[in-house]
A protein has these predicted regions:
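Extreme N-terminal starter segment of soluble prokaryotic enzymes
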Residues: 1-4
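Class I S-adenosyl-L-methionine
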Residues: 56-65, 77-171
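Class I SAM-dependent methyltransferase "Motif I" SAM/SAH-binding loop
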Residues: 7-11
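Short alpha-helix immediately C-terminal to the canonical SAM-binding loop
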Residues: 33-37
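Short beta-strand element of Class I
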Residues: 24-26
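Conserved acidic E/D residue at the C-terminus of a beta-strand in Rossmann-like folds
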Residues: 29-32, 111-112
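Conserved SAM-binding strand-loop segment of SAM-dependent methyltransferases
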Residues: 45-53
Length: 171
């Protein structure tokens, strides 16, 4: 069974999908204690870590996993908000990038609002993709609508998926 670490876990929406697909949710990391309390209730066999992922010094304290999933805060990218290019939360994807470099997981999945793709004429999104590729991943992205997957709301999300280049070999 492949292990998963969930960054910016919230109460565990992404983790639930991975759990239902047969993955082992190893660790959830979030800076909001209330979110982790709910996560712990729903994922009794998983660890939680109340950490600020904006502090790269804490990344070494997170155990390695096969897959990293992350839903970084979206407020600075959202088309329903002020879309502030200088919002410090916009840089939190860098903690995912740093963890990829440190722990070398087989794959990652990052989820965010569709506004991420158009922020600053798409340049922010292009930079994020380049960074993930520079860490040794083949990266793809898709815009998905949650209503197409049984969720009773229309909610478009960007999913960025990376697979280690060396795993993409044809034998």
């Amino acid at each position: 069974m492949l292990s998963v670490n969930d960054f910016f876990s919230g109460c565990g929406g992404l983790s639930q999908g991975f759990k239902e697909a047969g993955f082992k949710i190893q660790v959830a990391v979030d800076k909001e204690e209330a979110f982790l309390k709910t996560f712990s209730h729903n994922f009794k066999d998983s660890q939680t870590k109340n950490l600020d992922l904006g502090d790269s010094n804490i990344l070494k304290d997170i155990p390695k996993s096969d897959i990293i999933i992350a839903g970084p805060p979206c407020q600075g990218f959202s088309i329903t908000g002020p879309r502030n290019i200088d919002d410090p939360r916009n840089k939190l994807y860098l903690s995912v990038f740093e963890t990829l470099k440190l722990t070398n997981p087989k794959a990652f999945v990052v989820e965010n609002v569709r506004g991420l793709k158009t922020m600053w004429e798409g340049n922010v999104f292009k930079e994020i993709i380049k960074k993930f590729e520079s860490a040794g991943y083949i990266v793809t992205e898709s815009l998905l609508n949650s209503a197409d997957y049984g969720v009773p709301q229309i909610r478009h999300r960007v999913f960025i998926v990376g697979i280690k280049k060396e795993l993409n070999k044809k034998d």
